[in-house]
Amino acid sequence: MAMVRELELMTSWSNSMGRHRYPTRILVDSFGHKCSASDKGVWTSCSIRAPLQGRGSFRRGANIRFGSLPSSAAVATSGGGRGGGGVVVGGGGGDPWRRLDGSTASTELSLSPPPAQAAGGGGGGGGADALPWRHRPSPPSSAVATTSAAAAAALMAPMMLQPLDAGGGASAPPPPIRGIPIYNGPGGFPFLQPSPTAGDVGHHHHHHPKMGFYSSYHHPSTWPSTSPSPLAAPPGAASSPLDPTAAFLSSPHHRMLSAASGRLNGMLSVSDTLRSYGVPGAAAPGVIGGAHHHHHHLHGGQPFVGALASRFMPKLPAKRSMRAPRMRWTSTLHARFVHAVELLGGHERATPKSVLELMDVKDLTLAHVKSHLQMYRTVKSTDKPAASSGPADGGSGDEEFAGGGQAASGGGDSMCLRGGGGGGVAAAAFAEHGRSASEGAASSVGGGGGGDMDQSSAGNTSTTRWSNSSRDPWLSSNSCNMDAHRSVGLSSPIENLEPCRSSSSQVSNHELSSPSLEFTLGRPDWHGADHD
């Protein structure tokens, strides 16, 4: 019957942080399978190379003690070995393991099962002592039966598939290293939620299902560990069943496979997960895991959990910034805009914020005013006569003109520019830019009488649209007969404007005297509800 024993020796191992020598405890059964190793309370595989071949990279003449686990028989001491005062600690007084014999000892270990022989003497001397390791005689049959029964009870527990936990009960989680908590998952498999047992109820929050993937990347001393538990089982604690999955993961064959695959456990699960996220190169996870693992240990063992997660998570498309809603610059709204600009000292001195505050129109945003002012400056700085509308918002594309409350017809043959009552001195000045001062004064509406000027763009057969780009010239609709405006004074501006007014843009004198300043941001029922 195999018996699990504890071997304590000095180990020499190295990683990216350098070479280290630590006293290490190894749990070995009588068949030579190394179950786990412990280094100062942190589980690690160190550099105990291939215990199945019977070799270990421990220091020559190290202080090696052998003792059984708590599930075995009581610990007893016997006489010393030849020339070195060796101490043999065994279970039931008949331990088959023995200490190295001083400075002349060999580093070879014989991990074969102990023979079942009759009881013999203890102490050094004799021909059998010429070997550095020799098998002590087994205890009497009664002691063998007791020890074997205890070992059998310990080896039957792995069928329960429970992780090796410190003390077998609800223990405190391992202390964080440099302020970084250590995440431990049973079996070392990533993306597996551990079953809630009595041992991990107290620290269930440490077993995050996604953090099992990064459980062995928090400290250099845990590399390249594949063991499932963070603490060694103390000799005085109750026995904990050994997980056969943990024994397989800690075997040298599995460590060799893990090293070949970038030392990432469960690479098939990782590959499938990455492939589902659409990560390129997910079919070769060893390259990704190995490269990042090496990069992690070159930087002092600090965790790269966030960086690793960001590499595996899909890139979310950047959300477009919220833009102002679509709107139509009616002639009334534009007249109010021009009036505000003139009050601020002209288009060169006016700012979008000041114009917005001076206009005081509901639902008008700074983006609307800014783009409209930009186009207004563009028109004022050119020699072309300008149209009567401006851009709707900062980058929303083409917009329709809607002049004077009428819908822009399919031919786009009518656009209306109405001056606001009480201050419409600049309504026609915007449309009459480029003309002389006298002509502009003749065509402008003064005082509080209010005015209405319609420009019919004859020959413009397409729907009146324009682009927001400041490079595009404004559509000029100067085909309206302006001779009537030049030949008459300010006495009857409305009568002389009648020939230019289209049939769909009839407005009342009451509306001209007190125009409505309400406007909508592209509501489909705006024309039919209020302005039919």
From Swiss-Prot:
* InterPro entries given in the database record: Homeodomain-like_sf (IPR009057), KAN_fam (IPR044847), Myb_dom_plants (IPR006447), SANT/Myb (IPR001005)
List the expressing tissues: Expressed in roots, stems, leaves and flowers. Expressed in stems, anthers of young or mature flowers, pistil tips, glumes, vascular tissues of mature seeds, coleoptile and embryonic root of germinating seedlings, root vascular tissues, leaf veins and leaf sheaths, guard cells, and leaf tracheal elements.
Query: Per the record, where are the segments of Low complexity compositional bias?
Result: 453-471
Q: Which UniProt keywords apply?
A: Developmental protein, Differentiation, DNA-binding, Nucleus, Transcription, Transcription regulation
Q: Which residues form the HTH myb-type domain?
A: 321-381
Compartments it resides in: Nucleus
Which molecular-function annotations from GO does this UniProt entry contain? transcription cis-regulatory region binding
- Chain segments carrying region Disordered: 93-143, 224-244, 380-409, 438-478, 492-532
Q: NCBIfam families this protein is in?
A: myb_SHAQKYF (TIGR01557)
PANTHER family per UniProt: TRANSCRIPTION FACTOR KAN2-RELATED (PTHR31496), TRANSCRIPTION REPRESSOR KAN1 (PTHR31496:SF3)
**Name recorded for this polypeptide:** Probable transcription factor RL9
Q: What is the lineage of its organism?
A: Eukaryota, Viridiplantae, Streptophyta, Embryophyta, Tracheophyta
Q: Which gene encodes it?
A: RL9
